[in-house]
A protein has these predicted regions:
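Short histidine-centered beta-strand/loop micro-motifs
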Residues: 20-22, 42-48, 64-66, 72-73, ...
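Short, conserved beta-strand element in jelly-roll/cupin
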Residues: 47-63
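Residue-level recognition of conserved beta-strand positions in structured domain cores
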Residues: 32, 58, 65-67, 84, ...
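Short acidic-glycine-tyrosine-enriched beta hairpin
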Residues: 68-84
Length: 109
């Protein structure tokens, strides 16, 4: 058994968003995501087969959900449940420092 800290090895600069899988079973996947000024490429949307619960642990981000008039701004501690196949995209993450997300992907019961 290993003890680790979610804020260990958080880089100060990244050419691409970093995704670390912390736990994976057939029913659930837990990821730490680090973004520094990253966004979903223009015209692309996430359309995932699993539900995703995400929380911002550090930094800030804006998420767009298809069909909603305004982006959702997420600050430290803000979380969001994205149901399977709800199309969404990351519009912006803070370029001044790392945004650290914790994402839990799970099957619909």
């Amino acid at each position: 058994m290993t003890t680790r800290n979610l804020f260990d090895d958080v880089p100060r600069a990244l050419p691409a968003e970093r995704v670390d899988v912390l736990l994976e079973t057939p029913a659930v996947r837990l990821e730490r995501i680090v973004s520094i000024g990253h966004a979903t490429p223009p015209g692309e949307w996430y359309d995932q087969a699993r539900n995703e619960w995400v929380v911002v642990l550090r930094g800030r981000a804006r998420v767009r959900i298809e069909g909603e008039a305004e982006d959702r701004t997420l600050d430290i501690g803000d979380h969001l449940l994205l149901r399977a196949h709800v199309r969404h995209r990351v519009e912006w993450t803070d370029p001044a420092g790392p945004t650290v997300w914790l994402a839990v992907f799970f099957n619909t019961a």
